[in-house]
Amino acid sequence: MTQMRFTKEDFDTFTIEGLDPRMEVLKEQVRPKLTLLGEHFAPTLSALTGDEMFPHVAKHARRSVNPPADSWVAFANSKRGYKKLPHFQIGLWDTHMFVWFAIIYESPIKEEYGRLLEAKQEDITKQIPGHFVWSPDHTKPGAYKQSDMDQEQLKTLFERLQTVKKAELLCGIQLQKEDVINMNNNEFLQTIEDAFRKLSFLYTLTQKVS
């Protein structure tokens, strides 16, 4: 099987100084792996969600000065794009990798979906494992572990999605670089698939409002 696990060199790409040098290595080393992950997991996500899912590898085309701090492949039920749609992501920063379900700032269903999340909060905390994390901003590496949050903190994230124009909501797993490097390829792929199986619950909720 083709090796798709992220390596130390993949993570180190995001420590290279300068836009052009970093983008060169990103295109040569990381992007082919993201493409393979996209091809590998699109059928899995299609089966889990009931929607045909298409992979979109981040291009970072609009950057002219600052190099990207992370990169990813996203999956959505459209060939044309993903940012306005509920979607999944696999990606990495220099310190960790992530597997996300995401509703980001361009989504038109945020308010309605936020209300549904609030109504389904008890179900969500049962379906989503405690070690999964939540984030209100895809551009920042930090996140909150669900087991460390009380119900009020989680509710605040759902309310924010309804009321703040630029609000986002992401849920998933973060794996530290050292843990990923020590996995074999099968463990890596299985970890991602297991996360997607749990996160598909959040996607199916979007099908009630989109």
Curated annotation (Swiss-Prot):
Family: Belongs to the UPF0637 family.
Organism field: Bacillus velezensis (strain DSM 23117 / BGSC 10A6 / LMG 26770 / FZB42)
Cross-referenced Pfam families: DUF1054
Protein name: UPF0637 protein RBAM_014510
Superkingdom of source: Bacteria
HAMAP family reported in the protein's UniProt record: UPF0637
